[in-house]
Structure formats: C-alpha cells, structure tokens
Amino acid sequence: MRPPEFWNKPPSHFDLRACLLSPLGALYAKGTATRLRKGAPTRAPVPVICVGNLNAGGTGKTPTVIWLMEQLGAAGHEVHVVSRGYGGRLEGPVQVDPRRHSAADVGDEPLLMAAFGEVWVARDRGAGVTEAAAAGASVIVMDDGFQNPSVAKDFSIIVVDAKRGFGNGRCLPAGPLREPVATGLSRADLVLSLGDARAQETFQSIWGAEIPVPHLTGHVEPLPTGMPWQGTKVLAFAGIGHPEKFFATLRGLGAELCRAEALEDHQTLAPALLTRLEQEARLLGAQLVTTEKDAVRLPLSFRPKVITLPVRLRVAQGDTLLARLKDIAPPPD
C-alpha cells in the first residue's frame, strides 16, 4: 500500500487529515518510547553499527549497509550483518546461504546483502548478534532495528531520503514517522541524507536546524554494466519503497521507458504477474528490467529474461565517515 500523499508534505503545510490523526500518532510515539525503555539490551563483544531510519518505508538503508560491508571489509574486518529478514519465513538465527535459501526463506534484502558478505536473519536480534559474534564477526552491522531496544548499539546512522525528508514531522498514522524527529535524533550519532543536490538543499532548509549530530550527504547511482541504455526500450518493474526513483534512474540513463510497473514493497512475484509482464514486454518490443532487490525474488528460470540494474551508494564526505568508523571499530591487527 502506497503512503498517503499528505505524509510527505512539509511540516508547515496544513492538512486536516494529519491533524485529525495526530492523537493516534501521539499514541504510536508513546508506544515506541515505552518499548525502548523496556528490557536489558544484549551487549555484543564486538562493535555494533546500526543503520536505521525514523521513517516507515524505504530510505536507502540497504545500499548503506552494503557500502559499510564493503568499506569495513576493505579495512580488514570480518563483517557480519544482522537483519530481521522481513518477508521471510525463517525466524532464525540463521546464516543466509544464497545457494540454499530463497527470498521466501530469509527475505529479499538479506538475500541481496549476502552476495557481499556474511548475513544473519533473526527475529530476535539479540540472539542474532550473539550468533554473529560467536561465528567470528569483528564488527556487526545491524540492518534496521534503530527502534529495537534488544541490542546495544555503538554507533547509529539514520538514513533519510533527502527529497521526502522526515515528511510532515508526524508519527504514524498522521505521518511517516516511527518516532518524533527530536526523540529519534537524540539517540543517533549521524544523519545520512540521500538524494541529488536539489533535494539536499531542500532537506537542509527544512530540517537542518533540527539535526543535533553530524550530517553527511550521499546519493545512489547506477553501476556501469556495459549495457547500452540510450534508446533501449524497456518495461521496468520494481517492488521497492519508492519505485519511481528506479524508473527515474532508467530515464536518466536514456532508456525509453515503454511501461513502468510499480509493485508493492517486497511483493511476491507470482507466476501470473511475471507471465503478464513478459507478454507485455514482447508486444512492446521491450526488455524487462528490474532492481537488484526484486531480482532475488525472481524464479531462477525467469531470471535470464530480465536485466538487473545495480546501484551503489556514494557518500560525499566518505572520508569523514570512514575516520569515524575507524574510531568505533579499529581495524584488526
């Protein structure tokens, strides 16, 4: 289900629906605060870096986790990721093995991240962190879980889509937030806003004064694959948080977007859907294209029919973040 448009209006914009839902938003915020106060968090014997957000839905956490896996791995770390495994049936803790696990088992994001290193799926994040440390992790990256109190975090990065920012600044269901901005950022160590220069300027003008921690910027860009996108007719489909960003990327590469099929985030790619997409692409004379996250949900027999467009995070002040990471998780001897 797509979020209502009034969620992403700036806080200065009056909307009656948001106002009427605000009491429920206050209850949601209270519930989050109560949950965060409960229980004793598991303290891992190695540093834990949390990649989270304040918004419900996609903000760019997965590319950020992959970036951290690559950078920490290059520094000599044995990096393990712990994820809840949204959309998967296994409760865990279980180490993701792409050779025997499917997206239906562990979720699409953990399966994608497992191509870059060691990934654990665990509904009980504390148990997942314990297993990862026992398996030899020298640093653990927690995928999401900023509002989960079961694991002590050494460094928390809040990822935010610069174009949408923190929306109207209200909590669910009056707005997109899991908790109030001030409350969430008081526990954060860094904010990473993702988007182009124009989006970053807008984000800074609306939210810059509200950010009490270091604020870095970045953007996600397509990897060069040798594919001649210019003028190529494509039928694109995407089941991610904001599929329109994927479609815009294809247009920016010069592809002729004959059809754009926006699916629900993590949507099951049923045989009937894939058959329809294949038939439409054939009628249009177009190539099927999808995201990396959607590709791992495709049946193996269908994957040769689809081109995947990989993207990677670029952090504008990457050296600043790398220096901070070195302090938190010194490279192994």
From Swiss-Prot:
ATP binds at N55, A56, G57, G58, T59, G60, K61, T62. GO terms for cellular component: plasma membrane. Its EC number is 2.7.1.130. Transfers the gamma-phosphate of ATP to the 4'-position of a tetraacyldisaccharide 1-phosphate intermediate (termed DS-1-P) to form tetraacyldisaccharide 1,4'-bis-phosphate (lipid IVA). One of its GO terms (biological process) is lipid A biosynthetic process. It comes from the Bacteria. InterPro entries: LpxK, P-loop_NTPase. Belongs to the LpxK family. This is Tetraacyldisaccharide 4'-kinase. The gene is lpxK. GO terms for molecular function: ATP binding; tetraacyldisaccharide 4'-kinase activity.
